[in-house]
Amino acid sequence: MINIRFPDGSIREFEAGVNSLDVAKSISPSLAKATMAAYIDDQLKDAKDAINSNCELRLITVKDPEGLEILRHSCAHLLAHAVKELYPNTEVTIGPVVDNGFYYDFSFKESIGEADLPTIEKKMKELAKKSAPVSYRVVPKAEAIEFFKAQGENYKVEIIDSIADEQMKIYTQDNFSDLCRGPHIPNTSVLKAFKLTKLAGAYWRGNSDNEMLTRIYGTCWATKEDLEQYLNMLEEAEKRDHRKIGKVLDLFHFQEDSPGIAFWHDNGVRIWRQVEDYMRASNNKYGCSEIRTPLIADFSLWQKSGHASKYAENMFATKSENRDFAIRPMNCPTCVQVYNTKLHSYRDLPIRMAEFGIVHRNEPSGSLHGLLRVRSFTQDDGHIFCTPEQVEEEVILMVQQCFEVYKDFGFNDFAIKIALRPENRIGDDETWDKSEQMLKNALDANNVSYELLPGEGAFYGPKIEFHLKDAIGRSWQCGTIQLDFSMPQRLGATYIDKNGEKQVPVMLHRAIVGSLERFIGMLIEHYAGNLPLWLAPVQVAVMGISNNQDDYCKEVFIMLEKNGIRAKLDLRNEKIGFKIREHTLLRVPYLVILGKNEQEQKIITIRKHSGEDLGQMSVDDFCAFLDKQIQAKE
C-alpha cells in the first residue's frame, strides 16, 4: 500500500500501481471525467501513469490552465489524425499549443485551402466520438527513428535526430501515432468543443530556406459554451482588426519592398506623436533624461553584451570597410555606452535614462502581423543604473508609472507576472536568485499580486510583465521591467562606492508601452478605431451645409487650430448628409456643422461621432469643452 497526500493536506491509502484516474474515480465519477493529468510530486504526468510509492498528488482538470493546455495539445494530435485519415500521403511535422488554441504544420502532397477545413473538422469529430484510449510507449531513439521512417514521416525522423535524449515517447490513439513529450488526455471523447479557424503558410523550422508547409490553426475549449463565447470574440476582433481600420483611417500601410516595417501616413503619425509626447512627459515626471544612440554598432559590442551568442539569429548584420556591424535588436548596450562616458559616484545614483530607440529584429516572415509583429519598431526604453539597495524603490516607482500610463490610455484591467530564469541565460544561479527575489520584494512592498512564469525571463535577467485586458477581453503582454546584474559588468559600467571602491551598478530595463507600433495597433483594436479625443488624429471636422458658408467654415477652422485642436476643413461641394456619413466612418469625434443661421449668429452646431446632437455654442466655449476632455484623457 502507498500513501497519497492531497493539496488539502489529507492523506489516503491506495494499492501500489494505482493511477491518477483511479484516484479521481475513488473521489467522484465527475472528477474522473474532468481529469486530464496530474502533478505527482510536482511532476506533470499522464492520468494513467502508475503511482508506485508515497507521493503528493494534485489532479489537473479542464478547469486548470494546465488542463486546458493538455486538451488543446491533444486536439492538435486529433487534427493530425484526421488529416492522415483524409490525406494519407501527407507528412506531419509539429503541433504545439498557442494562445487560445493550437496549430499543426503539414506537408501536403495535394493542394489544400480554407474550403477544406470543414471536411477536416468533420473527420476530427468522427474520430473523437470513437472514444479511443490515448496511450504511450517509451522506446529507444533508434527504434523511434525506424518506426517513423517506415511510415514515411521524414520530418519526425529529423526531429528525433535533433533531440539529445536516448528515449522517445510515442503516443497512440486508434491507428494514429505521434512523437510527443506529453502528457495527453486519457481518451479522445473529451474533445467536444473545438473548431478549425484558419490556414496559413509556414516554413519548416521557421527557416525561409526550407520547404513551405501548410499550417492549420484551431481552437479548443472545455465546453461548447466557452467555444461559442470565444468564436463571438473572434468575430468582434475581426471587426476591430487594426489593419482594416488602419486602411479606412489612412494611418499606415505595409508592402513587400520592406516586409514587416510600416509606412506611416499623416494620420498615423499624428497618433504616434500623441503617444510619444505623452510618454516623454511621463518620463520627465519620473526623472528620466532622454538620450539617443546609434542604430548600428560594431559586432564586438554585441559579443560583449551577450547578444551575439544568445540572440544572433534575430539580428541583422552588415559589413563596412572590413568591419562587422549589427543593426541593434535592443537599445540597452548602446545606452550603457552613454553611462560609461562619465565617472559616477554612488551619490549620483540612480541615473535614469529614456530613449525612443528604433530596433530591428529578423522575425520569421510567417510570424509578421500588421503592427503587432514587425521587424522594425520603436521601443520606449528606460534604463536605470542604481545600487542594489535602490532596486526595490526604483521598481516600485516604475510600477507606479506603468499603472498611471495604462489607465490614461484606457486600460484599467491588467495582470502582473514575473518571468523567471530561462534555460538559455547568462549569469550564475546566485545572481539569478538575488534578481528574482528583488522583483518579488518590490511587488510585495507595493501590495501587488502577481503570477510566476518559470523559464520565461530574458537571457540576461528576470522581468516583471504587464498583461493588459482590452475591451473584448483579450490579454496583451505589454510593459516589462527587467533586472540585470550581468550586462553592466560585461560592458564595464561602474560607480565609486562610499569606500572609494569600484562597484558594478544594477541595471533596470523598462519599457511601458513597449513597441510604439504594437501599442498603437492595440489602441486601435481596443477602441475599434474610435480613439479618445486626445489621441484622435482628427479631433473635429468642420463642414458647411452649402458653399455659401465656406468663408465662415474657414474662420472656425482657423480658430480651432489656433487653440491647438486637430481639425479638418471639408469644403467639398457635396450634400451635408454625405459629409456627415463620411466623417462618421472616419471616426472623427466631433463634427461642426455650419449653416446660414450659424454664420449669422457666429455660433456653431456640434454633433458627436455617435450621432448625439450637442446643440449650439460659441467657438470659444467649444474649445474650452474640448480642452477639458483632452486634459482629462477622456
Curated annotation (Swiss-Prot):
Function: Catalyzes the attachment of threonine to tRNA(Thr) in a two-step reaction: L-threonine is first activated by ATP to form Thr-AMP and then transferred to the acceptor end of tRNA(Thr). Also edits incorrectly charged L-seryl-tRNA(Thr).
PROSITE patterns for this protein: AA_TRNA_LIGASE_II, TGS
Protein name as it appears in the record: Threonine--tRNA ligase
Domain TGS positions: 1-61
Free-text remark on how the cofactor is bound: Binds 1 zinc ion per subunit.
Catalytic: annotated span: 241-532
Keywords carried by this UniProt record: Aminoacyl-tRNA synthetase, ATP-binding, Cytoplasm, Ligase, Metal-binding, Nucleotide-binding, Protein biosynthesis, RNA-binding, tRNA-binding, Zinc
Chief subcellular location: cytoplasm
Enzyme Commission number, as recorded: 6.1.1.3
Entries under Gene3D superfamilies matching the protein: 3.10.20.30, 3.30.54.20, Anticodon-binding domain (3.40.50.800), Bira Bifunctional Protein, Domain 2 (3.30.930.10), Threonyl-trna Synthetase, Chain A, domain 2 (3.30.980.10)
A GO biological process held by the record: threonyl-tRNA aminoacylation
Alphabetized Pfam families for the sequence: HGTP_anticodon, TGS, tRNA-synt_2b, tRNA_SAD
Keyword Ligase in record: yes
InterPro entries: aa-tRNA-synt_IIb (IPR002314), aa-tRNA-synth_II (IPR006195), aa-tRNA-synth_II/BPL/LPL (IPR045864), Anticodon-bd (IPR004154), Anticodon-bd_dom_sf (IPR036621), Beta-grasp_dom_sf (IPR012675), TGS (IPR004095), TGS-like (IPR012676)
GO cellular component, one term: cytoplasm
CDD domains, sorted: TGS_ThrRS, ThrRS_anticodon, ThrRS_core
